[in-house]
């Protein structure tokens, strides 16, 4: 049987237990019926990102025609297991600093009316 390698990337919040993240990701792959047992799934810690710690779940499957469904199933499982283990998937946050204008809108309207 011929296998193809696939990947799912995910970011977790800084401060997360990286060993637990690895364990959860492997569990998610190992428990899907279409993920090959050999070669075994693996996890790479791929990045210290701007908002998250990056991980990559690598796994093999012979079922190329259903792979998007398999990846979706695994992502749902990852989300559920992360919630159970208090592992957060962050999202970028931006701070906006609005500078006030010294001229009020009322003053501008009055000047335009003249």
Residue ranges and their predicted role:
Residues 4, 12-16, 20, 26, ...:
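Solvent-exposed, non-transmembrane regulatory segments of membrane-associated proteins
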């Amino acid at each position: 049987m011929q296998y193809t390698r696939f990947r799912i990337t995910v970011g977790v919040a800084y401060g997360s237990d990286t060993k637990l993240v690895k364990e959860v990701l492997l569990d998610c792959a190992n428990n899907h019926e279409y993920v090959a047992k050999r070669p075994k799934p693996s996890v790479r810690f791929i990045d210290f990102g701007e908002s998250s710690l990056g991980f990559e779940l690598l796994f093999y499957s012979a079922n190329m025609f259903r792979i998007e469904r398999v990846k979706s199933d695994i992502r749902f499982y990852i989300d559920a297991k992360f919630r159970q283990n208090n592992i957060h998937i962050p999202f970028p946050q931006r701070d906006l600093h609005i500078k006030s204008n010294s001229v009020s809108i009322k003053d501008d309207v009055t000047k335009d009316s003249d």
